[in-house]
Amino acid sequence: MPTIDWLKTEFSYGYDSGNVLSRIPSLTRYREEKAIGASYRRVFLQGLAPYLKPNSRVLELGPGRGSWSRAILSRITKGELHTVDYVDVREWLEPSKYSGRLVCHQVTDNSFSELPDNSFDVFWSFGVLCHNNIENIETILVNARSTMKAGAIAIHQYGDWSKLDRYGWEKGRVPEAFREKPDADIWWPRNNQEKMSRAAINAGWEIETPDIGLLARDSMIVLRNPGTKVL
């Protein structure tokens, strides 16, 4: 199932987690946070915000209806956010409201060819790589790296079957029947910190940490593009 064609259609409705910064979550966000074992507000404030400056240029993969996008834009008041998605997200994200600070790219593959080289300080995704097999993930990391500045940071949530085993499949809302099926037939393909780290290294990134420890069910990796660190 985690083929590019499947991903293009499965989330075409635009995934929406609500306002990730509100102190009181919506019902949808509450259910997601219960499944993942984390607070989205804490994920943003501790996992992403420390890497954002007012003038940062950020690349976001798979924004959906913009839950994380709006949080990012609230921090990069003099910077830019470029989003990449298989669907046209402009109706949901409304880039015209941001005076050129938000650029939405609709793409057909994982080449990142629509984006300029050596342009971004931060590469972010949440709820995206968990639905990609490790081969797709490595392709994404390889091709996106050319768009990043030297020393740029990447932060990505991804599925971690080792943590999922400890957390509980039912609690994590992932069908335990997936254990017996190949990755091609499931929407939560096999991954863990070792596989993810290997894919990132193969793609040319340096690993800051394979997991920042903010999620109970999944992991969040922090990578650095070789060069002078940007903090």
Annotate the PLM regions.
Residues 113-123:
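A short acidic, Gly/Pro-enriched loop at the edge of an enzyme's catalytic core
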Residues 125-128:
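A short beta-strand submotif of the Rossmann-like class I SAM-dependent methyltransferase core
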